[in-house]
């Protein structure tokens, strides 16, 4: 933690010198600031503000080509579920070890990247929060401050849900290797007031303390963010704060059902305040704009061709998530694919089924060829790792994703294709949170909300026989898993609801997971309690004996035999 603190102390000092009060004291002995000074201060604060969303897309190609920013962490969460797989072990698949549950302990570089990236992002928010005195700030600066609080709340809500130890069948008593019970412990809190001395002995916050801290940030964001005049969806606005509160209360409700009412309240506020409708079939299946258009979402990340990640060509979201590019990692073999059993549960009259290939490509079957002609970006692409003279689509396994299109549908020019958008929050998620939160209290009411959403926006013929709380909640989560596939959210639902991950099966369909990834868990997987890296313990003694137990290699591979 001291290392993280030192890395940003210079920036913090610089930012601190830019506060309105500081400017007044240096150049204006009286109590009034000139208009020019105020404008200069606001300009400086704006630079700090825009640095926050920009930092989400920072890549670290020298450390490994899986290090392409927040999108990579979203993808790691999905890799740890049973819904999304990469069709390769090792070689070009840099995410193999998360899927294979290997090297997840404190001494490995894989966890190091997540930890370092997350806390560096936290520090970008702390820098702006430290720089603005709300008592003397202009309305414009208050808007910036509200956005910073929202970003920080997002970061800590993620960290809390990733690192909080929850009991599982592998470690049912919550004890780690040192014999200490770590159930309910999250991560150390580093805020704008944390000193180097404090960081050296900063224990993991309890669930209760972390919840209090996050809610404080969210309440401040809710109060201040209406002053934000920038309309860019790379910044959070009031609808996003409501959305974060909905996620927050769902997290708390995992241990205390009384919070479901508040989750439902804020989810409804979020989709009403968003002022946008769920994506249509045309939006979702567009060859040029499918899931790369930030205007369709509440909140997202936006890359431009000047971004370092885009300029690398291959260390970015599109390289890893768009199977149709001729230059990226995905098309080189580690295709990103949907779980066979999940795909089976999508009916053909649900247009979302067409976000994944129904079969392997062939020109010999007219129906198959017609499907690819309708939904593929460019059947004329002549590239594949295994067959340089063949059509790219010939090597794709069944259930390959077409969901995340390269920007402008361009599959060959990395500087164009990589300038894409990545979803952080969609209005669809809020509808599913609303339905689930209601279902835990009144299953019939939650079911009615689900049916209304599905019939209106996804499948006019949708129906479900679910009636009990468990049945209705499971059906809502199923539809949410399909809807938000690849967007990094399913991990949190599986963990909080103590749901199993099933990758090995032969009925009613045969598994499409590689042997190295075929684990079946009984309840939440042990690997969803992420381990704090040793470098943190080296500088923050308080976490050393209170880390999560290492989940690596704690499950036996499923076999049909």
Briefly describe each language-model feature range:
Residues 122-125, 211, 218, 260, ...:
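Inward-facing hydrophobic residues that define packing positions of alpha-helical scaffold repeats
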Residues 90-165, 205-209, 220-229, 415-422, ...:
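Conserved, well-structured interaction surfaces
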Residues 35-36, 67-74, 163-183, 227-316, ...:
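Short, surface-exposed recognition loops and adjoining beta-strand edges that mediate ligand/DNA contacts
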Residues 19-75, 319-321, 331-336, 342-362, ...:
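Membrane-proximal, proline-rich intrinsically disordered regions
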Residues 1-31:
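Bacterial Sec-dependent N-terminal signal peptides
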Residues 67, 264-427, 483, 498, ...:
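Hydrophobic-face positions in mid-chain alpha helices that act as interaction patches
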């Amino acid at each position: 933690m001291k290392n993280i603190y030192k890395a940003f102390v210079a920036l913090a000092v610089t930012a601190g010198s830019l506060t309105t009060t500081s400017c007044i004291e240096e150049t204006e002995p009286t109590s009034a600031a000139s208009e020019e000074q105020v404008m200069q201060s606001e300009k400086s604060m704006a630079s700090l503000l825009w640095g926050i969303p920009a930092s989400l897309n920072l890549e670290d190609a020298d450390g490994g080509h899986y290090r392409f920013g927040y999108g990579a962490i979203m993808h790691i969460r999905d890799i740890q579920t049973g819904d999304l797989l990469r069709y390769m072990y090792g070689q070009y698949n840099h995410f193999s070890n998360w899927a294979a549950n290997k090297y997840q302990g404190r001494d490995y570089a894989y966890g190091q990247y997540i930890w370092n990236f997350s806390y560096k992002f936290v520090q970008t928010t702390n820098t702006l929060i430290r720089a603005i005195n709300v008592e003397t700030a202009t309305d414009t600066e208050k808007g910036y401050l509200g956005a910073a609080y929202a970003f920080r709340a997002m970061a800590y809500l993620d960290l809390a849900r990733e690192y909080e130890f929850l009991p599982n069948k592998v470690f049912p008593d919550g004890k780690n290797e040192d014999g200490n019970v770590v159930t309910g412990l999250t991560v150390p809190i580093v805020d704008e007031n944390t000193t180097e001395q404090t960081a050296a002995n900063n224990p993991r916050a309890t669930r209760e303390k972390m919840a209090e801290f996050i809610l404080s940030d969210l309440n401040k964001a809710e109060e201040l963010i209406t002053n934000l005049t920038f309309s860019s969806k790379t910044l959070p606005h009031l609808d996003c704060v409501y959305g974060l509160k909905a996620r927050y209360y769902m997290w708390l409700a995992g241990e205390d059902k009384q919070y479901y009412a508040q989750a439902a309240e804020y989810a409804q506020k979020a989709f009403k305040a968003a002022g946008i409708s769920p994506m249509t079939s045309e939006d979702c299946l567009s060859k040029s704009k499918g899931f790369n258009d930030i205007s369709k979402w509440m909140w997202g990340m936006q890359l431009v061709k000047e971004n370092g990640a885009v300029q690398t060509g291959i260390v970015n979201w599109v390289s890893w998530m768009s199977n149709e590019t001729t230059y990226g990692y995905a098309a080189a073999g580690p295709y990103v694919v949907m779980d066979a059993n999940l795909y089976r549960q999508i009916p053909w009259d649900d247009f979302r089924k067409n976000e994944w290939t129904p079969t392997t490509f062939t020109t010999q079957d007219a129906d198959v060829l017609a499907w690819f002609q309708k939904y593929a970006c460019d059947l004329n692409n002549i590239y594949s790792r295994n067959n340089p003279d063949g059509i790219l689509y010939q090597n794709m396994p069944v259930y390959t994703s077409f969901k995340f299109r390269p920007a402008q549908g361009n599959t060959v020019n990395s500087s164009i294709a990589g300038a894409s958008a990545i979803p952080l929050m969609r209005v669809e998620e809020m509808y599913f949170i609303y339905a689930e939160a209601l279902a835990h209290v009144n299953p019939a009411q939650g079911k009615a909300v689900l049916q209304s959403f599905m019939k209106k926006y996804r499948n006019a013929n949708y129906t479900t026989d679910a009636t009990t709380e468990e049945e209705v909640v499971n059906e809502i989560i199923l539809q949410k898993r399909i809807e938000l596939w690849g967007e990094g959210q399913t991990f949190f639902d599986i963990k909080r609801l103590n749901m199993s991950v099933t990758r090995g099966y032969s009925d009613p369909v045969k598994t499409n997971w590689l042997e190295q990834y075929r684990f079946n868990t009984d309840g939440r997987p042990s690997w969803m309690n992420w381990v704090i890296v040793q470098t943190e313990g080296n500088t923050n003694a308080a976490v050393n004996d209170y880390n999560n137990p290492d989940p690596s290699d704690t499950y036996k591979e499923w076999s049909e035999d």
